[in-house]
Each structure stands twice: as structure tokens, then as C-alpha cells.
């Protein structure tokens, strides 16, 4: 008589196994599966929670970097001198140059970029053969621990600088992981091509703390300038600027050659021509840039080669409160604030007034007031304020 192999009776389990019954496995497997599934779920939950716990553990109550977002007029002067000595328009492919970049200029540039992109603060400081970057980024919506504080130490080297030490709060970060995260962040921001091209230019980096500069030896490649121009002025912005210049030329054609035209009339006409919807901000920023270049008597073709084919507005005197120079200050500061932010606009405006005071034309509170008013107007444009409608 064959043994009963039915899985319905627990009393037959041992007999089924001993007799080699093919259904024996069906009896014991249900008792093993729940434990395996439980271990798998715990493992998956741990994998999901571990990064979150690490992130929460690195939040701190106080920022490592606490400073304002402002840019000093001295940094504007240093940047102007640096560009004059390394003007890319005068460089040929393969030219070898060494640029001495002041450490304070790098410091304020890093702080400005972190402020604009992450709403945080940053610093840069030199030491012997190394430099340190510190960044504090606020984390909204968390009570108590509210900042990510990052330190990264760079070492001078042939080619691009290398991260030799890094930490997030008190948690050490391996240098390779820090470099990977840096490259990934740059890629996510959409600057992979520009970053790769810039890295290919650099031949040597040297820190000179005694002189307070970073020596950057590079070999020029014109493609970098083309990448930078394309990044700064995408096709949509160029199309908006072309439309704004056409509208400006059409407006000014209605005035006589010696007319003194209130800036408000021209500006309101340009802004009114901006379309409603998502394109409004782009078109208004384009209008400010076109108007600023017109009043500064600069040719946009220097930045945008396509502008050579655009209509040329006739030269007239646009005035603000009866003054041509006030109209210039207002329009230029408004464009700077809309494109680069309020700190840069304020710094450039103050720098120009300081230079005027040294050059003989004198420091003008009226011009400075026009600068600040233009900066505020540019901020309203950048914010898409309904007050402009």
C-alpha cells in the first residue's frame, strides 16, 4: 500500500519525505518563503534609508560660510584688468598664456555663483600649495538642522586642479567620490561640454599665497568662446534681441534727428511689444540688453555676430529727468540686473562712479541714484513682477 502523499495532512510530512514523494517539497516550502521575503524587504528598506540617514546626519544648525551676496567694486576692476590682458578676441588657436587671477576675485566669483545657483554662500582661500573652497547651502523646511556645509581642498598640479580632501559636515568624503560628484553636478546643470573644454585648456595651476593670486597656464582654443557665447545667448534669446532691436529702430524712426526723447516712452514701448506668457521674461530681458547697448553706444555684434544683419536704430538723445547720462546709467544697470543679478549691477555701477571721480568727471549721486533705480527695475523684470504689466 502506497503512503498518502497529500499536502493537506501535516501528519504525513515526514512519511512523504522518507518515501520520496514528489509532492514533499510543496509541504515544506511555504514555511521558508516568508523569512526570505522578510529579509529581502529589510535589505531593500535599509538601502533606501541609509542615504537618507547620511544626508540627515550631515545637516548642521549653523552655516560654515556667512557673508553677503555683494560684489566689491575692486573685484569689478580686477575682472576688467584680467579680461583686458587676456582678451579672447586677440588670441589665436594654440597661443600659450599665463593668467594671474587674484584670489579675492575667485572668492567673490564663487560666492556669486553659489548665491545665484544654490541660494547659498561660498568662499575661496589660499594656503601653501593648496586652496580651500567652502560652501554652505540652506535646506528649507527642516527645523533645527538647516545647512549643508561642504569643504574641498585643492592641490596645485599639472593640468586641472585635483581634490585631495573633502568633507560634508564632519563626514569625510573620499576625493574620488568628491570629484565624481562635482563632475555629475556640472553635467546635471548642463555645462558638461564647457567644463570639458575648459579642462582641456589648462596646462598648469599654481597657487601663490604670498602674492594672493592663482597662476593659470593655458593654451587657447577658440571653440571655448563659441561654447560660452552659445551658453550665454541661446537661439531663443538671439531671436528676442533681434525683434527688440527691430522694434527700437521702428520707434526711433518717428522722431526728428535732434529730438530729445524721454527714456520712459521708448522703454514702455519695447516692454509692451513683449508677448504674454512664458516668452515675456526672455523678451523683456532682450529689450533691456538692446536698449542698454544702444545707450552705451556699443555694437551688439561684438557679442552676437548675427547682430551685424539687424537694423541700426538712428542715434538720438534718450533722456531721464532731462539728463542723457542718467538714462545711460539706468538702462545699463537694468540690463545688468536682469541678466547677471543685483549684486553685479550694484558693483559695476559703484565702480564706474569711483572711476569717474578719479578721472575728472566727478562722483555723481544723481548717476548713482539712476544706477540703483535701474538695478531695481531690472530685478523686477527678472522676477516677472506684475507691477510691470
Stretches with model-predicted labels:
Residues 237-328, 334:
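Glycine-rich short-loop/terminal segments
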Residues 38-258, 372:
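Extracellular/lumenal and peripheral-membrane lipid-interaction modules
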Residues 4, 10, 31-33:
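Intrinsic-disorder-associated, low-complexity terminal segments enriched in Asp/Asn/His/Tyr and depleted
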Residues 5, 12-13, 21:
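Cysteine-centered motifs
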Residues 329-333, 356-389:
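Alpha-helical transmembrane segments that form the membrane-embedded catalytic/substrate-binding core
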Residues 341-357:
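Small-polar-interrupted transmembrane alpha-helices in polytopic inner-membrane proteins
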Residues 95-96, 167, 317-323, 335, ...:
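Second-shell loop/turn segments in exported
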Amino acid at each position: 500500500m502506497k503512503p498518502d502523499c497529500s499536502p493537506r495532512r501535516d501528519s504525513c510530512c515526514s512519511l512523504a519525505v522518507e518515501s520520496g514523494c514528489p509532492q514533499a517539497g510543496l509541504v515544506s516550502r511555504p514555511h521558508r518563503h516568508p523569512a526570505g521575503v522578510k529579509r529581502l524587504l529589510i535589505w531593500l528598506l535599509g538601502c533606501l534609508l541609509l542615504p537618507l540617514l547620511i544626508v540627515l546626519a550631515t545637516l548642521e544648525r549653523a552655516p560654515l560660510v556667512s557673508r553677503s551676496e555683494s560684489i566689491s567694486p575692486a573685484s569689478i576692476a580686477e575682472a576688467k584688468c584680467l579680461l583686458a590682458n587676456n582678451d579672447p578676441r586677440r588670441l589665436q588657436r594654440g597661443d600659450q598664456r599665463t593668467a594671474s587671477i587674484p584670489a579675492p576675485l575667485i572668492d567673490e566669483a564663487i560666492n556669486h555663483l553659489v548665491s545665484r545657483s544654490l541660494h547659498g554662500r561660498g568662499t575661496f582661500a589660499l594656503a601653501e600649495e593648496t586652496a580651500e573652497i567652502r560652501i554652505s547651502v540652506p535646506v528649507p523646511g527642516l527645523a533645527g538642522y538647516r545647512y549643508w556645509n561642504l569643504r574641498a581642498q585643492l592641490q596645485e598640479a599639472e593640468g586641472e586642479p585635483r581634490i585631495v580632501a573633502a568633507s560634508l559636515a564632519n563626514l569625510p568624503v573620499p576625493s574620488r567620490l568628491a570629484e565624481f560628484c562635482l563632475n555629475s553636478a556640472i553635467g546635471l546643470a548642463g555645462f558638461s561640454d564647457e567644463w570639458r573644454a575648459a579642462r582641456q585648456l589648462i596646462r598648469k595651476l599654481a597657487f601663490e599665497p604670498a602674492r594672493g593670486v592663482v597662476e593659470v597656464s593655458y593654451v587657447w582654443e577658440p571653440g571655448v568662446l563659441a561654447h560660452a557665447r552659445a551658453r550665454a545667448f541661446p537661439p531663443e534669446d538671439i531671436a528676442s534681441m533681434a525683434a527688440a532691436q527691430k522694434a527700437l529702430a521702428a520707434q526711433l524712426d518717428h522722431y526728428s534727428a535732434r529730438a530729445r526723447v524721454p527714456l520712459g516712452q521708448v522703454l514702455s514701448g519695447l516692454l509692451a511689444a513683449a508677448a504674454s506668457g512664458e516668452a515675456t521674461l526672455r523678451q523683456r530681458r532682450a529689450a533691456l540688453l538692446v536698449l542698454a547697448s544702444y545707450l552705451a553706444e556699443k555694437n551688439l555684434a561684438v557679442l552676437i555676430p548675427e547682430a551685424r544683419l539687424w537694423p541700426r536704430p538712428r542715434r538720438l538723445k534718450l533722456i531721464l529727468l532731462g539728463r542723457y547720462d542718467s538714462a545711460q546709467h539706468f538702462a545699463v544697470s537694468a540690463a545688468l540686473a536682469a541678466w547677471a543679478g543685483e549684486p553685479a549691477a550694484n558693483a559695476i555701477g559703484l565702480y564706474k562712479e569711483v572711476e569717474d571721480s578719479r578721472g575728472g568727471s566727478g562722483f555723481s549721486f544723481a548717476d548713482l541714484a539712476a544706477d540703483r533705480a535701474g538695478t531695481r527695475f531690472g530685478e523686477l523684470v527678472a522676477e516677472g513682477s506684475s507691477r510691470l504689466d
